[in-house]
C-alpha cells in the first residue's frame, strides 16, 4: 500500500509548517491549503512558496467557498488541520466545522486529524473559565467528526517546548531566566515537554497506522515527563549556576486572574491545570488511547537538556 496523500490546513503556522516538513520528509505527497485571504501577507506566501520548491502542492480554497474545500479534500487521503487555538495569537478552532462538512461531503477521507496538539479536551470538562473555551470548542469539533463517521486520530502533544521549556515555564517571556525563577507550588507536578519538530514527526507517523485509527495518541516520551523542578535543574546544570527560586501557592496563583485581559486569563487557567493539578499525567491512558513513543520507539526524540542548549 502506498503512502497516503496529505492535505495540511494551516501549513504556514507554528505547528503547520512543521507538519508539512515532516510529511515531505516521510515521503508523502503533500498538499497545502492556500487561502485567498492570505492577501498581502508576504511572510506566509514566502513559506508556501518555499514548500512548493520542496515538492509540496499548493491548493487554493476558501472557508467561505464550500465547493472549493470539497474539491481540495478530494485530492487526498488524509487531512491534518493545524489552525490556531491560542488566544494571544489567533483563535479559529470552530472554523474547522466547515472543514468537517467538506470532508463529510467529499466522502473519501481515510483519516482526519483536527487541530488539537495540546491537553486532551475530553479530560478537561472541569476546566476553569475562561480557559475552558479552548477545550469546549475542540469537543464541539470532535462531536461533529464522530457524528459524521469521519475516521480520525486526535493528537495530545502536551507542552510545546518553545512555549513551556525554553522559558522554564515562566509566563510573559519566551526566554529562560538567569537569576530568579518562579516555582509553581512545590514544583513537583509532572508536565510533559515536547520539541515541536518531534510533535510533527509523531503526528505524521500516525496517519497510516491502523493502531491509531479512531484513537487519541498521547505524546508522553518518558524522559520528557519532568517536574518543574527537574526542568529548572537541567537549565542550572547547563549554565553552571543555581537560580533563586520563589514559590507561588495555588491560591496566590489563581488570584492573579483578577484584572487580566481575556487571553491572559486563558493562559493562567491552562498553567493552573498543568502545573498545580497535573492534568497531563494524572491519568492512565485507556483503551481509546495510545502512547506515541511506545508505538514508534525508533524516533529519537529531543530531551529537554538537549533542547535548552541553544538558549545558553
From Swiss-Prot:
Q: Which Pfam families has this protein been placed in?
A: NmrA
Q: Where does substrate bind?
A: 270
Keywords for the protein's UniProt record, in alphabetical order: NADP, Oxidoreductase
Disulfide bridge map: none
Q: Which residues bind NADP(+)?
A: 10-16, 35, 44, 142
The terms under GO molecular function for this entry are: pinoresinol reductase activity
Return the EC number. Answer: 1.3.1.-
| One GO-annotated biological process of the protein | lignan biosynthetic process
Active site per database record: 138
Give the family, as the similarity comment puts it. Belongs to the NmrA-type oxidoreductase family. Isoflavone reductase subfamily.
What's the name of the protein?
Answer: Isoflavone reductase homolog
Amino acid at each position: 500500500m502506498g503512502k497516503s496523500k496529505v492535505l495540511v490546513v494551516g501549513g504556514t503556522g507554528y505547528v503547520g509548517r512543521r507538519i508539512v516538513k515532516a510529511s515531505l520528509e516521510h515521503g508523502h505527497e503533500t498538499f497545502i491549503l492556500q487561502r485567498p485571504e492570505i492577501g498581502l501577507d508576504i511572510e506566509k506566501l514566502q513559506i508556501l512558496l518555499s514548500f512548493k520548491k520542496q515538492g509540496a502542492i499548493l491548493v487554493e480554497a476558501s472557508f467561505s467557498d464550500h465547493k472549493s474545500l470539497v474539491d481540495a479534500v478530494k485530492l487526498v487521503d488524509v487531512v491534518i488541520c493545524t489552525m490556531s487555538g491560542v488566544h494571544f495569537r489567533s483563535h479559529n478552532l470552530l472554523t474547522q466545522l466547515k472543514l468537517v462538512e467538506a470532508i463529510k461531503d467529499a466522502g473519501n477521507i481515510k483519516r482526519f486529524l483536527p487541530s488539537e496538539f495540546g491537553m486532551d479536551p475530553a479530560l478537561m470538562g472541569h476546566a476553569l473559565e475562561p480557559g475552558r473555551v479552548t477545550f469546549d470548542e475542540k469537543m464541539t469539533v470532535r462531536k461533529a467528526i464522530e457524528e459524521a463517521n469521519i475516521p480520525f486520530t486526535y493528537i495530545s502533544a502536551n507542552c510545546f517546548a518553545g512555549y513551556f521549556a525554553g522559558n522554564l515555564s515562566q509566563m510573559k517571556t519566551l526566554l529562560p531566566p538567569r537569576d530568579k525563577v518562579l516555582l509553581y507550588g512545590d514544583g513537583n507536578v509532572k508536565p510533559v515537554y515536547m520539541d515541536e519538530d518531534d510533535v510533527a514527526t509523531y503526528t505524521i507517523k500516525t496517519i497510516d497506522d491502523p493502531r491509531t485509527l479512531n484513537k487519541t495518541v498521547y505524546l508522553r516520551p518518558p524522559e520528557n515527563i519532568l517536574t518543574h523542578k527537574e526542568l529548572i535543574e537541567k537549565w542550572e546544570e547547563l549554565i553552571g549556576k543555581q537560580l533563586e527560586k520563589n514559590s507561588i501557592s495555588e491560591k496566590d496563583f489563581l488570584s492573579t486572574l483578577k484584572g487580566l485581559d481575556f487571553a491572559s486569563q486563558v493562559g493562567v487557567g491552562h498553567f493552573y491545570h498543568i502545573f498545580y493539578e497535573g492534568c497531563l499525567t494524572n491519568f492512565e491512558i485507556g483503551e481509546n488511547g495510545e502512547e506515541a513513543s511506545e508505538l514508534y520507539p525508533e524516533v529519537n526524540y529531543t530531551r529537554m537538556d538537549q533542547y535548552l542548549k541553544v538558549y545558553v
